[in-house]
Regions:
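Short hydrophobic/aromatic beta-strand element in the GNAT-like acyltransferase core
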Residues: 3, 68, 80
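Regulatory sensory and allosteric helical modules in signal-transduction proteins
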Residues: 9-61
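Juxtadomain coupling helices with adjacent low-complexity linkers
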Residues: 85-113
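Helix-loop-beta substructure at the N-terminus of cytosolic sensory domains
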Residues: 1-15, 113
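A short, aliphatic-rich beta-strand micro-motif
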Residues: 65-72
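Anionic group-transfer/hydrolysis microenvironments
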Residues: 50-51, 84-86
Length: 113
């Protein structure tokens, strides 16, 4: 995976948080791209081919597949975990289960407000 990071809900949009990898999009609107759609729908999205995803935001030309997992606090999405791969179809059920477990722990630790 060439990019792993967080987008945090701030001021009505997702804003880039801690990440590892090349510089990424700074902000994403609700419902736009894989991250914004995961936020809007409050569910994990596993995308085998990002180029086939309607409205995909190409922050990096390296991105071929992606998984985005919402971090929930008190029933609301407060952040998303985003992992991008330079290979098609890189993410599977084990990846989803592991990242969702991490997101659940992070949600319980996330500051209120």
């Amino acid at each position: 995976y060439f990019w792993v990071g967080f987008y945090v809900v701030r001021h009505g949009e997702l804003q880039l948080g801690p990440f590892q990898g090349p510089l990424a999009c700074f902000s994403i609107q609700c419902g736009r791209g894989v991250c914004g759609t995961s936020w809007a729908e409050a569910r994990t999205l596993v995308v085998a081919d990002v180029h086939a995803f309607p409205g995909h935001i190409a922050c990096s030309s390296q991105s071929q597949s992606e998984i985005v997992v919402p971090v929930m606090k008190n029933g609301e999405v407060v952040a998303v975990i985003d992992v991008d791969s330079s290979d098609l179809d890189s993410f599977h059920e084990a990846d989803q289960q592991g990242l969702e477990a991490i997101a659940q722990i992070l949600g319980s630790l996330f500051p209120i407000g």
